Amino acid sequence: MAKFVFVTGGVVSSLGKGITAASLGRLLKSRGLKVAIQKLDPYINVDPGTMSPYQHGEVFVTEDGAETDLDLGHYERFIDINISRSCNVTTGGIYAAVINKERRGEYLGGTVQVIPHITNEIKERVLSVADDSLADVVITEIGGTVGDIESQPFLEAIRQLKGDLGRGNVVYIHVTLVPYLRAANELKTKPTQHSVKELRSMGIKPDIIVCRSELPLSKEMEEKLALFCDVEKEAVIQALDAPSIYEVPLMLEEEGLADIVLDKLGIKTGPPDLADWREMVERMKNLRYLTTIALVGKYVSLQDAYLSVAEALRHAGFYHGSAIEIKWINSEEVNCANTEDLLGSADGILVPGGFGDRGIEGKIEAIRFARERGIPFFGLCLGMQLAVVEFSRNVIGWRGANSTEFDPYTPYPVIDLLPEQRQLSDKGGTMRLGSYPCKLVPGTLAYRAYKKEIVEERHRHRYELNNAYRADLAAKGLVFSGTLPDGYLVEIIELPGHPWFLATQFHPEFKSRPNRPHPLFRDFIGAARKYKESRYS
């Protein structure tokens, strides 16, 4: 039978509950346990797929095509597992399921209420992850902050689960902030005390308190928190600000978090094997080089909108012994007159995915600059589509070439809506989503990176290269180095003769790991390193 760990947050949002949960997952896995992990999100959207990146940050896509919270990306990267759509549950999804059951008559004419119907549905989602994964431990993060009205059904459900499963099978971890008041030159424990009091008023007594803070807690403060929050002193865990999120698992291991969790769950394991993780962190702390990548997008004011891209770049940097400096370039500000000023110092240029026509011409201008100057270029999803548009306009000479997403009346619709998308009216969950195979052409950059013929990558798009123009594009030198195995859809394009110019219709960033960078990101940063060396040699 699986054991369950629930992670809640208090005082303020964005404390790092997701990093805490992911780090615990890594520590448990290092002890030989099979770990499953999920997030319960209190917003009423069914999923974040239609939410603005400014509201939510990036949408992380799973292997099975779920559009999920960005914390699931942390889970995959830290624990090195692929998780499924069942691992992200929202209030909207819960209510939709309950209402559908009511319409089908599954409640026998009863009055449908938050308790028991909504809470039972939540409990079923938590337990189903354990059943499907056959995990030893299931970690569940509850989004939001204790006291939020939206979180109440989730907190009630996890309260009930302790009674359903037995006390020895459930652990509650509460992540809080211990703020530092500069004027008083001291840390304050009162917000944590009040947060725990609020949580206990809902029937949940935390077993472990993880204290986020800028400065170390004194022994007296730990004892005070243990006394007022009614936990053992050893269960007051310090989580200091870290230079890198990848140091957090090692910091929490030193604090004894995993050992306390296992003791409370009655699980005995061998010692942790964190040698690879320690080696990676040590390598990360001793990077010898600096590589500058210009990321040209329209959501750059909120860098979480490109979280997986930024992490994948850093992973590749670790591999090459290089720190990565990301220049966040607003594509709306890029034009032919300022590309040198904005992009001239970059060792590589990356255009990520996105939607809508705002900032499109700036991205195309950035791609032109990379192509003409021989700067390594990497395009992702929309970045590939715009690379095709730029090539069509400026190499072939098709004036007005565009995607029908931005110009339905373009004379050269080199990017067009996928045929299966034409009859769809709903926006949510209707794109080409999830993992699909891609067949690579030997001798290309893509094949040299992957070193195999068939790869699987994750997608999130409605538009694709228009096959009516493939022959003309190829005749002018564009190489289609990756396609669906049947050859129907183009997945990767390249420009031979350029030091490194490659773009993908898929999102390789979602499969990168800190100790195993994605092959394309690895080779992109390698090319950027060579470009930088050639400039200064």
Swiss-Prot record:
The protein's name in its UniProt record: CTP synthase
Keywords: ATP-binding, Glutamine amidotransferase, Ligase, Magnesium, Metal-binding, Nucleotide-binding, Pyrimidine biosynthesis
Positions bound to L-glutamine: Y54, G354, L382, G383, M384, Q385, E405, R462
Organism encoding this protein: Pelotomaculum thermopropionicum (strain DSM 13744 / JCM 10971 / SI)
InterPro entries, per database record: Class_I_gatase-like, CTP_synthase, CTP_synthase_N, GATASE, GATase1_CTP_Synthase, P-loop_NTPase
Function field: Catalyzes the ATP-dependent amination of UTP to CTP with either L-glutamine or ammonia as the source of nitrogen. Regulates intracellular CTP levels through interactions with the four ribonucleotide triphosphates.
Family per similarity comment: Belongs to the CTP synthase family.
Positions with a binding annotation for ATP: S14, L15, G16, K17, G18, I19, D71
GO biological process terms on file: 'de novo' CTP biosynthetic process; pyrimidine nucleobase biosynthetic process
Keyword ATP-binding: yes
Stored Pfam families: CTP_synth_N, GATase
Catalyzed reaction equations: UTP + L-glutamine + ATP + H2O = CTP + L-glutamate + ADP + phosphate + 2 H(+); L-glutamine + H2O = L-glutamate + NH4(+); UTP + NH4(+) + ATP = CTP + ADP + phosphate + 2 H(+)
Residue sites binding UTP per the record: S13, K188, T189, K190, P191, T192, Q193, K224
UniProt keyword annotation of Lipid biosynthesis present: no
